[in-house]
């Protein structure tokens, strides 16, 4: 790809063009097609650009850290999320992987949701939207007419995602979530099926997810009735057997692979205590269902991702700087996003509320107000993992064997403990996230195992995420996988 060889200075660090040999042809072709910027001729230059960008905090670059981050990436110990690799240090898009937003019930709130989606999708982020508070089909409106329900408005988002793309890397992607008790749940779970029903209420370009809870699972277990309750009137619209509804969900998943299933009771039980004390609540997951963050009328949750490569666990697990550097890197990138949207110098104070915060949004950045506020308050990041199956293969360990279970516990215990330690160290210098004041942590959320479809390709074809390699020979178009990478 590049005729340059050996070690050379580049952007204030030393890169090694010979490390291109660690990549296979598919990796290099993917990088060249989607991720190199302007005059870049080698993946090493892209890795260096992203490393320098991600080692900069409040306009001060730590070049020693940038060198280490570059070394980690070029040795395939980890990979930047594709938004960081594609957009970091450039003028195209944002380095954020995930946005989670809330959809209100009024016309103004619905149209505001469409406008926010346009901003977020065109800037590089995948979106997960919560629709459980939108009144159901047939419910009366303030004008005296009858509501058409939430699905026709999801159809607008469906078209929106086709219209707005994310540059050359991915097209706009969106996952709609609703509650298992919503009256439209039966239609919602099959809205991605091409056959059956009204074509104008089909959303073939969206993903969808169903929020369940422990009460529903108990009803399935005991074969009880389940009430479908309109979120506006709070009245039961229909009563259905819980097992019948559960069976329909499983049938839809067998046919289309979706809807995702998220148990909100489990998610909210694990919410940091500081956020519980503020009355915050998780209402949905994100585009690829790997992270759960609180959302509401004032908050569009933000998450900045990257992933370690477990294929090289034996190497990087001995490096005491590795996880510390990656958590610091993700916090830096999140700070770039916040600084891009808000005038922090004029904001004043460390613990601003939404009303004060939105007064200091920079001109032209109004579409990111809720996202920047959420990032500022909770500073959530998501360090994930890929290469699990590749590690097992390299060590002749059966995927379903006891040694695989042992490695699983060992690897993720190391990642979690190291990430918590890193977040505490960063908080000593930069302060705790306002949402979790008193926790000693910089970040309210630290880990998220993303699908890594593109990142695994870039890492020389390592196995994606924690999934097994499903077959020995296959074709792939990662741009159409719509993953956060």
What is each of the regions a protein language model found here?
Residues 295-296, 445, 449-471:
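Non-catalytic terminal/interface segments that mediate subunit docking, oligomerization
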Residues 3-59, 63-66, 134, 143-156, ...:
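Conserved, charged catalytic cores of large soluble enzymes
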Residues 324-372, 376, 380, 395-452, ...:
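Internal maturation/activation junctions in enzymes
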Residues 94-97, 123-127, 170-175, 184, ...:
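Short coil/turn connectors at secondary-structure junctions
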Residues 474-485:
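Single conserved hydrophobic/aromatic residue that forms the stacking wall/gate
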Residues 21-29, 74-80, 110-111, 115-116, ...:
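Short, hydrophobic/aliphatic alpha-helical segments
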Residues 37, 51-57, 70-94, 99-142, ...:
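Function-dense linear segments that define catalytic or interfacial modules
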């Amino acid at each position: 790809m590049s005729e340059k060889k050996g070690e050379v200075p580049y952007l204030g660090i030393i890169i090694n063009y010979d490390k291109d040999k660690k990549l296979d042809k598919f990796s290099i072709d993917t990088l060249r097609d989607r991720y190199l910027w302007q005059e870049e001729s080698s993946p090493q230059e892209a890795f260096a650009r992203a490393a320098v960008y991600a080692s900069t905090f409040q306009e001060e670059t730590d070049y020693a850290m940038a060198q280490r981050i570059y070394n980690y990436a070029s040795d395939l110990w980890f990979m930047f999320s594709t938004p960081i690799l594609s957009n970091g240090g450039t003028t195209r898009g944002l380095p954020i992987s995930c946005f989670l937003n809330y959809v209100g019930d009024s016309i103004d709130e619905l149209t505001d949701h469409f406008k926010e989606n346009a901003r977020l999708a065109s800037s590089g982020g995948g979106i997960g939207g919560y629709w459980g508070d939108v009144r159901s089909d047939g419910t009366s409106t303030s004008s005296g007419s009858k509501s058409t329900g939430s699905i026709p408005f999801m159809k607008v988002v469906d078209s929106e995602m086709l219209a707005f793309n994310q540059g050359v890397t991915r097209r706009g992607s969106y996952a709609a979530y609703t509650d298992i008790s919503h009256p439209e749940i039966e239609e919602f779970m099959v809205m991605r099926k091409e056959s059956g029903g009204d074509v104008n209420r089909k959303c073939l370009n969206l993903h969808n997810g169903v929020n369940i809870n422990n009460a529903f699972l108990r009803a399935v277990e005991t074969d009880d009735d389940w009430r479908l309750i309109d979120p506006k009137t709070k009245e039961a619209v229909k009563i259905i057997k819980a097992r019948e509804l559960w069976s329909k969900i499983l049938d839809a998943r067998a046919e289309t692979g979706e809807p995702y299933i998220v148990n909100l009771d489990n998610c909210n039980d694990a919410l940091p205590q500081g956020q519980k004390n503020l009355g915050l609540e998780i209402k949905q997951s994100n585009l690829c269902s790997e992270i759960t963050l609180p959302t509401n009328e004032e908050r569009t949750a933000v998450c900045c991702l990257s992933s370690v490569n477990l294929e090289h666990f034996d190497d990087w697990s001995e490096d005491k700087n590795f996880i510390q550097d990656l958590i610091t890197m993700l916090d830096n990138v999140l700070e770039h996003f916040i600084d891009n949207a808000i005038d922090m110098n004029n904001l004043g104070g460390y613990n601003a509320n939404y009303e004060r915060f939105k007064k200091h949004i920079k001109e032209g950045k109004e579409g990111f107000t809720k996202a920047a506020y959420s990032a500022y308050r909770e500073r959530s990041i998501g360090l994930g993992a890929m290469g699990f199956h590749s590690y097992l293969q390299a060590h002749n360990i059966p995927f379903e064997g006891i040694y695989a279970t042992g490695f699983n516990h060992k690897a993720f215990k190391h990642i979690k403990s190291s990430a918590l330690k890193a977040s505490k160290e960063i908080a000593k210098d930069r302060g705790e996230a306002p949402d979790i004041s008193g926790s000693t942590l910089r970040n309210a959320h630290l880990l998220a195992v993303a699908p890594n479809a593109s990142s695994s390709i870039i890492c020389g074809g390592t196995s994606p995420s924690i999934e097994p390699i499903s077959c020995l020979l296959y074709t792939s178009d990662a741009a159409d996988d719509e993953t956060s990478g």
